């Protein structure tokens, strides 16, 4: 709770300074299910939390207009020890790296900012970009939402059931992303929730095809 309140307070302060415009139509908050990300064992060097964690915040154009990546050459400035760094390590865990290495080198955060965050400039600078992603994550408790609809870790459900459960809180279509495990079973890997550039309302996501939505398959929510 304290970290969430801190993120909200920092968001209000820094966003009051420079509300300018970036050239994108919407942005997708991509949340990873750590149990699927860290399978098979040995892939992660952090204990996977039993909740969704941030992969990234991806600005983009509407369908048929292309995907935005590496929009500027702006450098990533490492976060120094303090409240923002602690919040990032809680909400945006660098699962592939030991904590000390992640905090020192910040590889995931650097990669996401260079690839996607630069496309939010000048509307959102680096600090605003990361604070915004964490604030948007706090808007939705997807794990509780899924559980409310009987979708619990270790069970399989259709694409439509998972999508409809998430729509009860987003009101707009989310983007489900899947991976196929070594047994050939589709697993829920990530959930994308889309927002307008101002982040003041939801936006229908462009749909990935990794979950084979037209076939409405059974998808494993890994325990």
Curated annotation (Swiss-Prot):
Record-given protein name: Ribonuclease S-2
Classification via Gene3D superfamilies: Ribonuclease T2-like (3.90.730.10)
Classification lineage: Eukaryota, Viridiplantae, Streptophyta, Embryophyta, Tracheophyta
Family of this protein: Belongs to the RNase T2 family.
Functional summary from the UniProt entry: Self-incompatibility (SI) is the inherited ability of a flowering plant to prevent self-fertilization by discriminating between self and non-self pollen during pollination. In many species of the Solanaceae, self-incompatibility is controlled by the single, multiallelic locus S. This stylar glycoprotein is associated with expression of self-incompatibility in potato.
Gene Ontology molecular-function annotations: ribonuclease T2 activity; RNA binding; RNA endonuclease activity
Subcellular location: Secreted, Extracellular space
EC number(s) on file: 4.6.1.19
Keyword Endoplasmic reticulum: no
Organism of origin: Solanum tuberosum (Potato)
Tissues where the protein occurs: Pistil.
Record's catalysed reaction(s): a ribonucleotidyl-ribonucleotide-RNA + H2O = a 3'-end 3'-phospho-ribonucleotide-RNA + a 5'-end dephospho-ribonucleoside-RNA + H(+)
Keywords, ordered alphabetically: Disulfide bond, Endonuclease, Glycoprotein, Hydrolase, Lyase, Nuclease, Secreted, Signal
Carbohydrate-modified residues: 51
GO biological process: RNA catabolic process
């Amino acid at each position: 709770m304290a970290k969430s309140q801190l993120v909200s307070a920092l968001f209000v302060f820094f966003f009051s300074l420079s509300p300018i415009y970036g050239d994108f139509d919407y942005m997708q908050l991509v949340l990873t299910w750590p149990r699927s990300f860290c399978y098979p064992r040995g892939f992660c060097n952090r204990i996977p939390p039993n909740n969704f964690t941030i992969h990234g915040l991806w600005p983009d154009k509407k369908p048929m207009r292309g995907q935005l990546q590496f929009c500027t050459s702006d450098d990533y400035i490492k976060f120094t020890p303090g409240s923002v760094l602690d919040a990032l390590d809680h909400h945006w865990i660098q699962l592939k790296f030991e904590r000390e290495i992640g905090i020192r080198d910040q590889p995931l955060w650097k990669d996401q900012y260079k690839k996607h965050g630069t496309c939010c400039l000048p509307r959102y600078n680096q600090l605003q970009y990361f604070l915004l992603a964490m604030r948007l994550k706090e808007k939705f408790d997807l794990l509780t939402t899924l559980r409310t609809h009987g979708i619990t870790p270790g069970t399989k459900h259709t694409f439509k059931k998972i999508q409809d459960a998430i729509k009860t809180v987003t009101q707009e279509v989310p983007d489900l992303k899947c991976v196929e495990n070594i047994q050939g079973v589709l697993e829920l890997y990530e959930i994308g929730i889309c927002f307008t550039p101002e982040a003041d309302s939801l936006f229908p996501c462009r749909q990935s095809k990794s979950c084979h939505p037209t076939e409405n398959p059974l998808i494993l929510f890994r325990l």
